[in-house]
Each structure stands twice: as C-alpha cells, then as structure tokens.
Amino acid sequence: MLEYMDYVLRQFEECTSWNKDNSYENIVGTSRNILQFDIPTALKVQVSNRATPYSYNTLELTNNKTINGSLTYLYTNCENLDQFIEGSSSVHLQQMTQSFRYIEPYYHHYKNNSKLEVPKVPELPISLAYGRMFYPSSSLEAMYIRRFPNYYQFILKCSSSKSGSSILTMYLQKNTGINCQELIFSTNEALLGYRFVHNFVSAGSKSNLSLYNNSSLSIGSEIWCALLNLSPGCSTTLRYCSHATNTGKPLIFTLSLNPLYGHVSSTYSIKTHENLTFCTKYDFNIYSIQSNLTLGMELWKNSSSIPVERPSEPVETIEDWPQLSHDKTPMYYHLLTRTENSGASSQRLLKDLNLTFQSSLQKINKERNVIENFNERYSEANFTQVFKVSTSLRDMNLRLLWEGKIRGFLISAGAELTQPPEISTNGLDSLEHQNWSLISPSKFGIQLQYSA
C-alpha cells in the first residue's frame, strides 16, 4: 500500500506530465510490485490531511516492541494539484496499490492523430519540498524536486541520523518520452551513476498480423562507480510490452543482465482479466550455475454493484457516406482523372477500393476498442480489496498480502512465511533436506491509513 506522501508524489508527477514508468528505476516495476511487494512489519497507523491546496501533512505511529512515530510535511507550488488528490474514502484502491503498470507506447507523430495528446510541459519551474522527522530517534529525511521546462527535473534527497551519518543524493533527469537520461551522485562512498532508457519508435509492419500496433520495445542500462574505492557496477534490461489483440489483455516481458556478477533474470507478467494478474521470474547465475523460479499473482475484488455497460462506438462504413469526395477518401483521390465524363466511373472505382480495404479498417477499430475498453474497465472499476501471493522455490518462502478499503480506511495486512536454514551433516546446504512443514512466520504486520 502506498503511503499518503508517496501517493501525493505520484499525483504530482501526473499533474506535471512526468512519466515515471519511462525510467530505468521502474523498468521492471510490474514484476517487482507483484513478486517483491512490501509487507508491513508492525502495527502502523497513519492520519493525513490536506491543510491547504499547496500543503499536506501526515502523522504516523508504529508499535514494534516500542512506540515510534514520524511527522511529515509537504509543500508544492504546483497549480491544480489538489484536484488530483482524493481522500481515503473516495480514492480508487488501484491508485493506492503498487500493481500492474500499464506501459503506453510512445508515438512520435502526435500531429497526425487528433486523439493523441502532446504531453504538457510546464512553462514555469515547479517545485516540491518534503520533510520527515522520526522520533524518538530524531532522524530526518528531506527531498526537494524542481521541475524545469524542456523535460528536465532535478531531485535532491538527504537523510540524517542522530549518530552523525548523513547522506546526500542528487538526480538530474531528462525525460523526452522517446528516452530518459539520469545523472546521479551520492555522498555515500562518492557514488556516481548514469542511467538511461530508450524507446524504439516503430510502425506497423507487413509481417505483423495485428493492424493496430500498440506494442512498445524499450532498452535501458545503468553504470555505477564508487569513486572512493573504485568499485564499478552495471546492468542492462530489455522490456517488451504489448496487448492481445482479440482480448486486449496486456503483457510485459523483461530480460536483465548483470555482466559483472553473471546474473541473468527474465520476467513475464500478464493480466488475464481485469481482476487477475500472473507473474513469473527466473533467475540464473552464469558463474555459480544456480537458478531460482519465483511465482506470484494478485486477485482483485470489486463491490457488488453492477457496472454500467458502455455502448460501442458505431463504425463508419461506405453506406454511411452519401457521396465520396476528396475529404472522405484522400488516399485514392489522386488516382482519378478529373474529367466531367468520368464522374460515374470514378465513384465506382472509389467504392471498389474502399470496399476492399473496409475489413482491414474495421479490424483496426475493433482491436483499438478492445484494448482501450480493457484498460478503462480496470482503471474505473470500484475495487474494494486485493490479495497478493508470491513464492520462491529456492528460498522456500511464502509471501501473503491483503489490502482493502473498509468504511473509508485503507488497510494493509501481510505476512511472510520462511524456513530457517537447515544444515546437513556434511555442513552443506541442500534443497532436498528442506521441509515445507517447518516454515514459520518471519514477518507480520498491519497498516491502517486515513486521509481527508
């Protein structure tokens, strides 16, 4: 479950047209949300409210053997952000839950299609300031975001504890839609990094059976270097997103490679229904020849109210056209001879050509409507609860999480069942000596949120 300040930050990105999915940090966000979801570790209560249209605050209490708390304050000069923020009683559950992420393809020619909207870039710099104080430890967290025109964004994060250790991290990002670049520097061991994601812009090909191309292919990479000890790090990830043309079900495939450690990881996620998602992840290490298979799913449940069915949009056919002209048929109008005697033959030729391609045009509209209707049914559904489960065959663990809305409160409860490591007589760990009957809960917690 997203915390209230994380929800405000996500809406701030949406209000300023910043695509968070177009970054290397979230290139495998879907599989991470389904397989490696966060589980509460204690009893946590959060109360949040919107003091003014530009300021938000949160009070949090946590009971884990001792009572701890935190106070959070956020301020921004972003106009109309309060219209994107909703309270816990009216917000959709899918907006507060880290779940399947729809990756919209990047279209280069915005002007050629009136239905595509150009991303709105803020004309003036927009800023956001965030601060959080923990007690009784007296630790501090701070973040400052500056959104500039021309697709630039600067982020400054700082954390300080009573022991004296402080970490400062700076991000300089440029997100143009077709690619995203990030330059990162952290005072922790003088860490310097560079990350980028590039989206391939492609048009429909003759070998593609689907006339409506709604798929996207992205490749990203990151390079790190700790300047104090000269420790390098790098990784590369490939992501492919598409939809089933007959059902509109979205699917995401990723392939990651870390050449320094010899780690290869692949994930496959598919939303088989509006309320059901499956995800698998396979890890393999080239050097140690070790592998692991992780499985996960999430199941949504909506209210008992019957959704209202939307009427399908009518498809324009040849019979609906009273007379063919250049405005109606710009594709074949240049083939006609502009003579007075050839008017009837020209009309017959245009009609024959459009009848030939009418089935293809109707197929494009049908595929597009199926995909758009599937996404709209999920985003507008009134879900009341979601159940997540994931397991790892090598780690022999079981992760459970339930999140829901009850009387205006957002509740999250979860547990992780693991097995303590068992050592054989020769001192080596072996999977065949492990027993699922010995698993016990290693993590359990409940989180309660309310916001007005």
Curated annotation (Swiss-Prot):
Asked if Acetylation is a keyword of the record, the answer is no
Topology within the bilayer: Multi-pass membrane protein
Q: Which GO terms describe its cellular component?
A: ERMES complex; SAM complex
Name where it's found: Mitochondrion outer membrane
Biological process (GO), any one: mitochondrial genome maintenance
Keyword terms: Membrane, Mitochondrion, Mitochondrion outer membrane, Transmembrane, Transmembrane beta strand
Q: Which Pfam families match?
A: MDM10
Self-association state and partner proteins as the record states: Component of the ER-mitochondria encounter structure (ERMES) or MDM complex, composed of MMM1, MDM10, MDM12 and MDM34. Associates with the mitochondrial outer membrane sorting assembly machinery SAM(core) complex.
Role summary? Component of the ERMES/MDM complex, which serves as a molecular tether to connect the endoplasmic reticulum and mitochondria. Components of this complex are involved in the control of mitochondrial shape and protein biogenesis and may function in phospholipid exchange. MDM10 is involved in the late assembly steps of the general translocase of the mitochondrial outer membrane (TOM complex). Functions in the TOM40-specific route of the assembly of outer membrane beta-barrel proteins, including the association of TOM40 with the receptor TOM22 and small TOM proteins.
Query: Which HAMAP family does the record match to this protein?
Result: Mdm10 (MF_03102)
Record remark on domains? Lacks alpha-helical transmembrane segments, suggesting that it resides in the membrane via beta-sheet conformations similar to those predicted for other outer membrane proteins and porin.
State the family named in the UniProt similarity comment for this chain: Belongs to the MDM10 family.
Return the protein name: Mitochondrial distribution and morphology protein 10
What does the organism's lineage look like at the top?
Eukaryota, Fungi, Dikarya, Ascomycota, Saccharomycotina
